């Protein structure tokens, strides 16, 4: 993957434009449209109403990234929505504390979309932190090749203090009891 092909992730918590992505499967089948339509301002939606195909579909990138098919094979017949590769720049990459509150269907309950992270490239100096409702926080060190479910509706932040860019393959998967059981088994290994 060429870093120049990654699109800046438009958001007010993308400090210094150091968070970028590519779409493998997403809205309109466009490699550089990394957000959901719900994240766009109403004026943009009106202006682009006729231009955009809002269906979720694969982009040409899907066939070019073997890790995607490997991960999709692991997931088997789980229904999935968006698939993205998100990069957090080395040394300066930071996502300020935020929630993904526009993802109203996110979660681990039946029929909700569980956001799974599969680190493709990372380093020990990448720090992910998530806050709970009681104000306590948890830090996660996600290793390459591991699978993580993260509830992005909770406040969270990510910082890359390392000397290597961080790349995560992120897939939104339709949740059910089988997925919850599978995630529990995966976490026990």
Can you name each region flagged by the protein language model?
Residues 25-27, 36, 88, 121, ...:
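Structured loops at beta-to-helix junctions and adjacent beta-edge loops in soluble globular domains
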Residues 68-147:
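Catalytic core of non-heme Fe(II) oxygenases with the double-stranded beta-helix
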Residues 38, 104-106, 178:
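A ubiquitous, low-specificity "background" feature that marks scattered single residues
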Residues 12-15, 30, 82, 96, ...:
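Intrinsically disordered, low-complexity peptide-like regions
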Residues 1-77:
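Non-heme Fe(II)/2-oxoglutarate
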Residues 123-189:
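Catalytic core of Fe(II)/2-oxoglutarate
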């Amino acid at each position: 993957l060429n870093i120049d092909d990654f699109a800046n992730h438009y958001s007010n918590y993308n400090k210094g434009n150091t968070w970028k992505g590519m779409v493998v499967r997403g809205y309109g089948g466009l490699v550089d449209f990394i957000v959901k339509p719900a994240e766009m301002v109403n004026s943009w939606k009106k202006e682009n109403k006729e231009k955009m195909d809002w269906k979720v579909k694969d982009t040409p990138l899907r066939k070019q990234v073997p890790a995607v098919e490997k991960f999709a094979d692991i997931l088997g017949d789980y229904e999935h929505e968006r698939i993205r590769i998100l990069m957090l720049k080395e040394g300066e990459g930071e996502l300020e504390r935020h929630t993904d509150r526009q993802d109203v269907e996110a979660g681990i309950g039946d029929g909700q979309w569980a956001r799974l992270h599969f680190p493709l490239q990372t380093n020990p100096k990448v720090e992910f932190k998530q806050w709970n409702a009681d104000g306590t926080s948890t830090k996660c060190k996600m290793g390459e090749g591991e699978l993580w479910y993260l509830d992005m509706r909770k406040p969270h932040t990510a910082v890359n203090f390392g000397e290597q860019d961080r790349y995560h393959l992120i897939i939104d998967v339709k949740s059910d009891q089988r997925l919850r059981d599978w995630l529990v088994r995966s976490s026990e290994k």
